Amino acid sequence: MASYTSTSGQFAVGKVAAANQDDETCMHALKLLGGLAVPFTIKAVIELGIMDLLLAADRAMTAEALTAALLCPAPAPAAAAAMVDRMLRFLASHGVVRCATESEELGSDDGKSCRRYAAAPVCKWFARGGGVESVVPMGFWMTSTTNMETWHNIKDGVLAGETPFDKAYGMPVFEYLGANGTMNTLFNEAMASHSMIITKRLLEVFRGFENYSVLVDVGGGNGTTMQMIRSQYENISGINYDLPHVIAQASPIEGVEHVAGNMFDNIPRGDAIILKWILHNWGDKECVKILKNCYTALPVNGTVIILEYILPETPEETLASQLAFDFDLGMMLFFGASGKERTEKELLELAREAGFSGDYTATYIFANVWAHEFTK
C-alpha cells in the first residue's frame, strides 16, 4: 500500500530538504523556458476584468466572488472560478497579487482551504481607464501575435543575417505598421502610455522647459508628451513631428502643431528637440544622421534632449539591468543588428560625432530612463 508523508499537517509538494546544484539549475532552466506564462496570465486577468476588480476592492476576494463579478458571466461558473483560482495563485507565486489561505489564518487542520486574493503594489501599473498611468498598452503590444511571430524568427534571422521582424513579415516594422491599421493603433497606444509615465516624471525632475519658446518632439506619436509638457509650460509652442501614418491618427492639441515628415530628411526648427525612444531603433550611422539634422535645426546653445535606457558596461543581475537588456533584445527583434540600447559612453560619442560640443548632462527620470542633454 502506498504511504504518504506530510509536514505540519499539510501535504508537501516540491519541498526539498537539501537541494543540490543540479536540482536548483534544472528548476531554473524550466522556469526560464516557461517564462511566457507570466505575461500571458497577467494579460488574461486584465482582459477578464479581474485586475480592475482587485484594484477596486477594499478587501481580499475569493476566485468565486471575482468570477461572479465579471461583466460577462461565465456559463460554467464553477469551472471558471477554478481556473481563475489557479491563475491567481500562480501570479501570487510571482508577487503579482497577494494570497491568503483562510484555513491557515483560522488554524484549521481539516484539510480544507479557501484562498482570497488582493492587489499587490505592482498591480497599480496594470490598471485600465482614461488618464491612468498604466503599462497595459505596452504589455498588449508585447504579447500581440505580431510580436510572438517575430520571436519565432530569431534563429532564422541570425542565420540569414536578417532582421527577425523583416524575416517574419517581409518588410520593415514601420512599413508594416503603416499598412496595418490595427497594429499601428496598438503600437501608438503603447508608445503613448509609456510617454505618459515618463513625461510625468520628466516634468517633476527636469529643469529647463521654461527657457524654451519652440519645442520639437521628434517621433512624438500622437502628441502625448508635448501635450503634457504644454500643460505646465504654456510659454512653449510645440511641434509634434512624426511619419505621415502616425500624424494621421493624432488628435488636435492646443498649442501643438502636428507635422508629418521624415527625420532623416529634415527636422523642424526649435529651441530644443526631444528624442524619446528614437535612437535605439537605429544603427550608429543613422543616429548620427538624425543628430546632425537636430544640430542643423537648433540655434547656437540649443539643446537636444535624448530619453533612452542606459546599458551597464557589464551585465548585472539587477532589475534595472535586466529591463535594459530586455529592451535591447527587443530592438534586435525589430531592427536587427542596427537597433540597440546603448551605454552612456556610446551615446556621448554619437552626439559628439554629430557636432554637439557644448555642455552635457544626464538626469535620471524614472523606470531606468535617463534624460541626456546635449548643447550645440
UniProtKB/Swiss-Prot annotation:
Keywords on record: Methyltransferase, S-adenosyl-L-methionine, Transferase
Catalytic activity of the protein: (E)-isoeugenol + S-adenosyl-L-methionine = (E)-isomethyleugenol + S-adenosyl-L-homocysteine + H(+)
Residues annotated as catalytic: 280
Organs and tissues of expression: Expressed predominantly in root hairs.
Complex formation: Homodimer.
PANTHER family per record: O-METHYLTRANSFERASE
Record-given protein name: Eugenol O-methyltransferase
Organism: Sorghum bicolor
Lineage of origin: Eukaryota, Viridiplantae, Streptophyta, Embryophyta, Tracheophyta
Record gene name: EOMT
